[in-house]
Amino acid sequence: VEVCPTGALTDLKPFSLQEREEALLPCRAACPAELDIPAYLRAIADADPDLALSIIYEKAPFPGVLGMVCNHPCEEACRRGELDQPVAVCNLKRFASENGAPPEIQPQFPPTGKKVAVIGAGPAGLTAAFYLNSYGHDVTIFESEEKPGGMLRYGIPEYRLSRPVLDADISRLLRGIELRTRTALGKDFQLAELLNGGFDSVFLSTGAAHSKKLTIQGADSAGVYWGVDFLRELSKGNRPSLGNRVVVIGGGNVAFDAALSALRLGAKEVTLVCLEAEAEMPAFEKEITHAREEGVKIMNSWGPKAIESQQAAVTGVILKKCTGVFDEEGKFRPSYDESTLERVDADNIILAIGQEPDQGVVFGAGMPSAGKSGFFKVKGTGTDIEKVFAGGDAVRGPASVIRAISDGMRAAREIDGFLGGKGRLDASGRETSVVAGPGPEHGTMSPKIGRDEKFSERARTALGCLDPEERKKSFSPIESGYSAEQARTEASRCLQCQLRFQIQGVALPPEKWLVLDKKALEGVPPKEGVYQLADEKKITTRIAGTQNLLQALAGELEKESAGYFQFEEDPMYTKRESELLQKYLQKY
């Protein structure tokens, strides 16, 4: 990092603190959970995975999960990508979670006596519960399924997210929290019962774990599955018997997960059909790459017209050409060329066209207001029912895991504030840490930078990956993590933009001329002294002594005789006036 030592070269324009962070630390600014990415990368480069994991835990209680399934918006923003490829931030997070010693989780505040109910044990709900518990509140989670995790457990296959990793993260964050499983809102209890039963606040994190339905001919035929439901049953150990030919309809992550799962269940041919063109598919790039490697055929810009069947069993699907996905206003409104059709043989169809909340729960008695699609309406995270907050997919729709964690953290802050706390702020106004050990400065890290002659040549380190044919035989994780040497090498590719962020602007000499206006005159005393006036070019036009500086300058302001002024108190103002006049004459 090099800066001008004289301060003659400065930023073209002044930055606010937030603007400076976004401009100079793009990775951290892009992370919804506000992870201190440069800090934990530096710790890994210094061979300290324990510290790296501790830093991650400060903002995200799911290090193992995020190391495997985060969509890493930080990498999209990484400045190293402008040189060659972004730093593999997600892979390094995985290394820290697999090799670092989990830090001791410490309560931030003593018990408050307040009770909070969290409905839904997905990533948003679990995160909110974790932080609310650390703030000293008594937290109870209500979960309709047998186990916690939400879409992490029931929507992401094991080959992408190892269940031991998921279980380890959840078990750590649940310490001190009561979990009630197989307890469904609207069926086993009502919202009003919680509000009237001693809970001081309720957080709705009920998710969007239901498949959107498609009303086309044959959708009710035997052999037709719905994407999220298909993955949920698979995660529960209920493996459906599929035929040799499977067609998946959809272009998102659920569709690709269904396609790869179908291969692992024995399907010989899997075709994925989506409305979007190849560059527009919403699924993560890695998912698309893995699908192509495993032999999934992708048909872009096609949509389903009808499902064909014989004796109520699927035989194929008729497709129509999609000419556009969004209208001129950017709204989802597909258009088709009905004259261009194609038929694909199939023994099974998996419809994965989107997700939505459980409409029966959302629009049940005594629930907060929601839009037509079933997503709760909120201001911040607060709903239109006092004490009730909502967040995660139940508000924004299906989103990433890191976004759900961010929503849960925000909800915890707002609920804590509602209950009389101060959120994550300590007495100094700085966010407190939920882990024992290094504080926000992470001062144990090496400050040494030095010169690395091969720095620019260092290529991104890829994760180990099973052979495509081998990985289709089981639901074992596709990728393996870094070795210690690989992790240090990859972490050392970081440009360390945080160093530039920590260099504050050079203090310039104070401006001697003040703008002649009412605000500036508020700082002028009604005392004896000398003042000078200047024009718009800051050339002196008047030097005068006075018994009352404030009164004299107020008069000059009324006359609009100058644009700038300066003053100095001096009881011997006539003498000082003469001195200044002499200096002026000598200069000009």
Where are the model-predicted features located?
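Ferredoxin-like iron-sulfur electron-transfer modules
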Residues: 1, 9-30, 51-72, 102-119, ...
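Iron-sulfur cluster-binding cysteine motifs and their immediate structural context
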Residues: 1-16, 26-46, 67-96, 140, ...
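Beta1-alpha1 glycine-rich phosphate/pyrophosphate-binding loop at the start
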Residues: 34-44, 53-54, 60, 82, ...
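Feature captures the FAD/FMN-dependent oxidoreductase FAD-binding
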Residues: 51, 110-111, 115-119, 167-216, ...
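Glycine-rich dinucleotide-binding loop and its adjacent helix/turn
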Residues: 95-109, 171-187, 211-265, 369-385
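FAD-site-proximal beta/loop scaffold in flavoenzymes
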Residues: 220-243, 307, 327-398, 402, ...
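A conserved FAD-binding loop/helix module that cradles the flavin
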Residues: 394-425
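GIY-YIG nuclease catalytic motif and its immediate N-terminal context
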Residues: 505-555, 568-581
